[in-house]
Amino acid sequence: MYHFETLIAKSIFRGGGQFDHHQNHYQYFCIAAKRQKGISMNFMNNYNNTNPIIIGIDHGYGNIKTAHCCFKTGVAAYDKEPTFKSNLLVYEGRYYLIGEEHKEFISDKMTDSDYYILTLAAVARELNIRKLTSARVHLAAGLPLTWVSEQKDSFKEYLLQNDSADFAFKGVDYHVEFAGADIFPQGFSAVADKLREFKGTNMLCDIGNGTMNVMYINECRPLAKKCFTEKYGTNQCMLAVRENLMKQFGVSVDETVLERVIRHGTADISQRYLTAIRDTATEYAEGIFRRLREHEYDPELMRLYVVGGGSCILKNFGSYDKDRVVINDDICATAKGYELLAEQKQNRKGGIV
């Protein structure tokens, strides 16, 4: 717990855990204000020749998100060049199709090389947006709230296992030098630039593909001792939908159809299938609130802030007081938050070298 509190303190607080409204908070919102123009600060100026580009990456179980893009968390490896080359990454003599074969949930993201390969793909996408093929990069990433203390050092080592990487993605050659990495708490990072809105008692709920992370933020201060992680992400909702469709109709529906209904509330399918999917998603949304109540959520006493890719489920199928619940359905919000925290840390240190 100490490491987690220290991480929060380094990101947001100064001096005995007290919030510095005159310096850190102001500096933070200067960074955030510049971001409101639609792109990150380092996207606009790339700093200079000595400072690396900060790239925030949200390593989700369902999707990899950066500040500007999102793609499926899936890797299919080949020893020989595959027939279909869409989203093909070539690294150290092997071929990887990015976005293929949905990756199963694992609590330790460092058990294989998949997330490293996905990191390279994410970096390539961000560099492509900047029209760069060679760069020094500082990674800003994160882990679930209750895992960050124990895993952040090993995850940082995992991401920085090589000083540099030469690879090709979608037919373009890239050379990347890794200048460093910062690991922040998931969920919290998505709202770090909005802490001044968290007056009174607040509950933050980050719904991802594999996990649901819950955190209390009271009077603009995150409470390290009131953080919870549950294996109740959108993947559990998808599994429940599949099981219900098989039980009712004996059919297996393509995942893209299910995702469209969950994300948008509807799809071009018959009404009976649509109703079955909606009913199951509604039950899942009720399950989210049930679990929140187990962590003492009371809508009359606190506000609820929902972030993450699964926030669309509550938005489309949940029953709640819209005056007491704020839903941020920007799937890239956490990755943007990682960059903000890393930029703030850089400014405090006078620059990353």
Language model features by range: what are they?
Residues 207-213:
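Ser/Thr-glycine-rich phosphate-binding loops at phosphate-binding pockets of nucleotides
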Residues 2-204, 221-236, 248, 256-353:
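Nucleotide/phosphate-binding catalytic cleft detector across ATP-hydrolyzing
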Residues 66, 214-216:
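Conserved blade-register residue in beta-propeller folds
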Residues 242-248:
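Acidic, metal/cofactor-coordinating or nucleic-acid-engaging core segments within structured domains
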